[in-house]
Every structure is written in C-alpha cells, then in structure tokens.
Design a protein with these regions (language model features):
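ABC-family P-loop ATPase nucleotide-binding domain
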Residues: 1-17, 228-234
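Residue-level detector of flexible, active-site-proximal loop/helix-junction positions
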Residues: 83, 225, 233
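H-loop (His-switch) and adjacent beta-strand-loop-beta switch element
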Residues: 218-230
C-alpha cells in the first residue's frame, strides 16, 4: 500500500466574506483544494473572481471568514500573529506583480533581507544569496539597486528573495503582468527549471496565456467558486 503524500497546502471549505456598505460580498465561496510538493499550478478567472484573495488566504496575509487552511500540516488559525509572521517567512515565498523590492537596497541585500531578519550567520547568508542570484541569472548584478535593473531583472530578484529560506511553496500573483514577452518567458524558464530540478511548488494567479501554457494544473475561479480543476498534459 502506497503512503499518502502529505499536501503542502490544504484548503478546506474556505469562505471569505466582505461587508461593503452593508452589502455582503463572498469573495471566496466554499473552496476546497489541495496542492502537493512539485505542483506547478495556475489559478485563473475573470477580474474579481477571487484569485488574489485566495492567494492571500493561502499565504496567511488574510484570514478566512470560515473554513480551514493548513500549510505542511499546520493550521494557520492556531498560530498567534507573531507566530504567523515567523511561519510565513519560513514556509511561504511571495512574488508580486509590482516586484516589491526595497529601493534603497541592492539586489543582494534584497535577496538576503529575510535571512537577515532571521539572523542567519553572515557567511551562510552570503553563500545563499550568491547561489540564488546565480540561479536566476544575475550573478553579475549583486550591487545593482532596483532602479538600475529592468522589470524582468527586478522580478528575477524577487524570485530569488522568495526562495531564500527554502519555503514549502511560492505564491506568484500575476508575476508576468508588467513584463515584456522576452522577460516573461525568461522568468517562466527559471521558475519551470526550479520546479523540475528542485520540485519547488508554484501556485500562480494570472491572466497570462504564457503562464497557463506551462502549467501542470489549471484551476478556474468564478465568483469565488472553483468551477474546474484540470490536470494538463505538457
């Protein structure tokens, strides 16, 4: 009998409701999903369907109104706010549409930022930073600040930063939205390589057909409801 693979992420009957001027809006409406190690999954749907809300819930940036989310077997609802911050830094990597790099820090300092917060020894931090910048093709841009980098290069720094603490998975919210075609394909090549070689789990939200074409799994949301969940043959 095969051992059951523990899900990296489990979402159990989750709801997220907002009250806007006395009108109740169900942004997420009874979603149940799970993601396993090595998934390269894409969440799609029209604007307002709940894609970003769902990613924020998975990453512990927002709390569900009802239901339960487990990361590597840990219930997010049982963590105190301070514990949740530490848990996110250890287990979840984030890549945002607008890069979210710190303007006054160099590429290397941005990548090492969370490691610095976690008080990694200097030599260990430097070695990990060097390894990551090399893995995203930026070994020659350690000292460059975000303003000295193209959009594609900034997003590659963001991916390196997200990988710094060897998280369970990466959440990527519209990561190619601000990139030209060449930069987007280059970024996706890097993410796909990390997925293939290191079994890094990626969960995207996107409107980008280029991302969808590479996905192993496409989940479609409409009005906060999962209307389809398809395995893709690449």
């Amino acid at each position: 009998m095969k051992n059951k693979i523990m899900a990296v992420v489990e979402i159990n009957n989750v709801y997220k409701t907002y009250n806007d001027t006395e009108v109740e809006v169900k942004a997420i409406n009874g979603v149940t999903l799970s993601f396993e190690k090595g998934d390269f999954a894409v969440i799609v749907g029209p604007s307002g369907s709940g894609k970003t809300t769902l990613l924020n819930l998975i990453g512990g940036l927002d709390k569900p109104t009802d239901g339960e989310i487990l990361i590597a077997g840990h219930r997010l609802s049982e963590l105190k706010p301070s514990e949740l911050i530490d848990f996110r830094m250890d287990h979840v990597g984030f890549v945002f549409q607008s890069y979210n790099l710190i303007p006054v820090l160099t590429a290397a300092e941005n990548v090492g930022f969370i490691m610095n917060l976690q008080k990694w020894p200097k030599e260990k931090r430097k070695a990990r930073t060097d390894e990551l910048l090399s893995s995203v093709g930026l070994s020659d841009r350690h000292k460059s600040r975000p303003s000295q980098l193209s959009g594609g290069q900034q997003q590659r720094v963001a991916v390196a930063r997200a990988l710094a603490t060897r998280p369970e998975f990466i959440l990527a919210d519209e990561p190619t939205a601000n990139l030209d075609s060449k930069s987007a394909e280059s970024l996706l090549d890097i993410m796909e390589k990390l997925n293939h070689e290191e079994k890094m789990t990626f969960i995207f939200s996107t409107h980008d057909v280029r991302v969808m074409k590479r996905a192993h799994r496409v989940i479609t949301l409409e009005d906060g409801i999962v209307v389809s969940d398809e395995k893709m043959i690449n």
